[in-house]
Structure formats: C-alpha cells, structure tokens
C-alpha cells in the first residue's frame, strides 16, 4: 500500500465516509463496512479528494486527454481532479460533464465544459452495478471519443450477480482499465496494521471469503 492510499483511508475514516459495523447494501448483502463518498462535502474535503484522485491517475500511468464526470456525483470529482492535476502535477487538462436533461436554449446540448474528444478518463465515486458507466459510454461513443480508463475511489472487489464484479464486467465489456484509489485488499492491509480494529478485520476477511473476486 502506498502512502497516499493509507492517507486516503484515514481521510475517509475521519470524515465517516468509511465506516465499519454491519450494513445492509442495496443488493441485500450484509456488509461489515460502508463507504459513502457523499460525505466528502466541504471545500477542504473536495480539495483533498481531488489530490487523491490525481495521485491515483498519475500513479496509473494511463495516458488520457480529458476528464469526464458523469452527472451527478462525478461532476465535483472531475472538477476537483482537474484542479489538482494542474496545481500539483503540472497537467492542465480539459474536463467536461453531462447534464441529465439536455437544454434547448443557452449553451444547448447535454454536455458542459470542454468538447468531448480524444482519450477520455471517466471519474466517479464507486461502481455498483455499472449503470452510470454504460450511460456514459453511450455519450462518449456518440462524440466519437474513446474511453481511456475509469477511476473510482474504492473497488469493493466483490462479485455482482454472477461470478465476476461489476468492475470486471466494465473492463470486459469496454476493453478499458478500471483503477481505484483503494481496493478491499488495501482496506484489509490497513486493518492488519491496527490492533484495535481486530474485530473489524475478522468480519471484512469473512466477507471477502464469501463474496470476493
């Protein structure tokens, strides 16, 4: 685990974005941890979040021309990541996002920001069922751009309804790499360092045994 990944876990714990306990997911599964990126909700939170996303992007080595944030949660993520890339990595790249409803006046169209072209890096909070990615792919393909990759904050590394995860489905269907700031494996490595979190470690390991990929 890299220093920025450990820092991100601690940031998420401090903001109660990441919690350990017992939680029922939309799928009906009982999970020993929960991640709610919507709780990164202040100016400082967003500034820090962008730095973590930018760090993961640079670390990945994936080449891309533009950041795309799917409405709605991807919008602030794309914005703050673009700022962090410019300020901390000297990479001044364009970004854009989609509207849920196309306007028929003013700017018009369903996109805001830069023209959607070239190699697109899609940024979002998490991938649960992959629906937002599929909707975004329709937009990207309609503009004759290509998907360079997808970056999310957390990869839960668990099976969907079949034998593979929603992330693995996206990688298979679109031939792109999905990267994340942290994975379930990183969470477990972090818990292994914390003696006072032994009960959570056992629960997360058991969950991975049952649902992991």
Swiss-Prot record:
Name the Pfam families on file.
Pribosyltran
Query: Which terms are listed as keywords in the entry?
Result: Glycosyltransferase, Magnesium, Pyrimidine biosynthesis, Transferase
**UniProt key word Disulfide bond:** no
Q: Which CDD domains match?
A: PRTases_typeI
A GO term for molecular function: orotate phosphoribosyltransferase activity
User: What domain of life does the native source organism fall in?
Assistant: Bacteria
Ligand binding (orotate) = 34-35, 128, 156
Which cofactors? Mg(2+)
Under which main EC class is this enzyme filed?
transferase
Which pathway, metabolic or otherwise, does it act in?
Pyrimidine metabolism; UMP biosynthesis via de novo pathway; UMP from orotate: step 1/2
CC annotations in GO: cytoplasm
Q: Which InterPro entries match?
A: OPRT, Or_phspho_trans_dom, PRibTrfase_dom, PRTase-like
**So what does this one do?**
Catalyzes the transfer of a ribosyl phosphate group from 5-phosphoribose 1-diphosphate to orotate, leading to the formation of orotidine monophosphate (OMP).
Q: How does it assemble?
A: Homodimer.
Q: Which family does it belong to?
A: Belongs to the purine/pyrimidine phosphoribosyltransferase family. PyrE subfamily.
Q: Provide the protein name.
A: Orotate phosphoribosyltransferase
Task: Give the species.
Answer: Salmonella paratyphi A (strain AKU_12601)
Q: Which gene encodes it?
A: pyrE
